[in-house]
Amino acid sequence: MAAATVLGRLSLIPNLSSKPKLKSNRRTTSTSVSVRAQASFSDPFVLQLAESLEDSLSASPSSSLPLQRIRDSSAETLLSTPWPSRKDEPFRFTDTSLIRSSQIEPISTQQRNSEILDNLTETQFTNAVIIDGFVSNLTIGPSDLPDGVYFGKYSGLPDELTNRISEFIGNFDSGDLFWSINGMGAPDLMVIYVPEGCKVENPIYLRYFSGETGDRESKRLPVSNPRVFVLVEEGGEIGIVEEFVGKDEEGFYWTNPVLEVVVQKNAKLKHSYLQKESMASAHIKWTFVRQEAESEYELVEVSTGGKLGRHNVHVQQLGPDTLTELTTFHMCVNEQTLDLHSKIILDHPRGASRQLHKCIVAHSSGQAVFDGNVRVNRFAQQTNAGQLTRSLLLKPRATVNIKPNLQIIADDVKCSHGAAISDLEEDQLFYFQARGIDLETARRALISSFGSEVIEKFPNREIRDQARNHVKGLL
């Protein structure tokens, strides 16, 4: 039989106080990894990886101060963090041995991959092609972006924006070990900036490719660390699309991206995320979002790739009347693990969050993982937070592990969560067959419709069609 685990916790803690905290900027002096390791705990494997990351950037041109600040703080965190195991609660159901047992090689130089660039599908949107963490192609038409909008490398920022962007770089709460690996290994920083009151009509399209692949027999695993920062000033609006694709369907590589987002007062960001990595790869992504008062952040995600795929989403509401919406769909069609770990922190009155997560496991050795945390702190009165996860297990021994966690400290709230796990309904299949439709066609139609609820939430038709066709091709 298919296996399913649901671990739920609803906690009411009326006497605890939790006020929003601002993290202060800290400047550090760059020192070698080996020197820093003497004064802190270090897992030997992590230390070796940290040294490889440092060596990979040693030949690069001198970095900007904010990027160097990220590298220094990430090195400190990395050297005090052991490699995660199944004994660690955040990785209880997620096995990272695919990476741990490999010979990891950070990609240190930018290679112009003509095969990828020559075979790009056309898009109407302003876009960047990022290969192995390096920006390889940037396409911006003369009238594509309104005045004041910036899209490009940090090193190309105009002087009047440099100080503004630098206020936020390296000033996010720390993530886990993989976040620190990105911080040490990111070769550059991509920046998207939207000025006050500016509404960008068309989305900005970030297309990530893995051009360098390793060898499963020798266990050589190239790793890339793309990093993007987005700042939407007060009253601004924009959409961004992230698409991750492997050069080879069976490519053996590891993509380890980080996206950091600041949405200022009354600003809006629509975030579309399409993960189509190779079935032999590892993909571990962090998305950090900070929302100010009256702002809106919406994520729509479809993930199907990677032998190991994980998305860590951390959203913090830093003002009242704030809306967060996460709509995600994971589909396992091979021997793979797809994992969503989300955390939404509501700290102010009249905040709202809506979360829908769907997953399909269509392989007997496939596994889906969902760990969804929503924390409603004491000052977040009149909050409305809802969370729902639905899963389809289509093969014997297919597995899903669900852990909804709703923590409520405020006492004037409207909050709910639910989970449902099943196979396809027999009466639905019978309905199709009674109308002359064969069983296999009926199953494919029902499976496709299960994910379409999420796919239809993509705000742009081009992305909807691409996601729909991709999912159909996997069925």
From Swiss-Prot:
GO terms for cellular component: chloroplast; chloroplast stroma; plastid. It is found in: Plastid, Chloroplast. Coiled coil: none annotated. Residues 1-36 form a transit peptide. Keywords: Chloroplast, Plastid, Transit peptide. One of its GO terms (biological process) is iron-sulfur cluster assembly. Interacts with NAP7. PANTHER family: PROTEIN ABCI7, CHLOROPLASTIC. This is Protein ABCI7, chloroplastic.
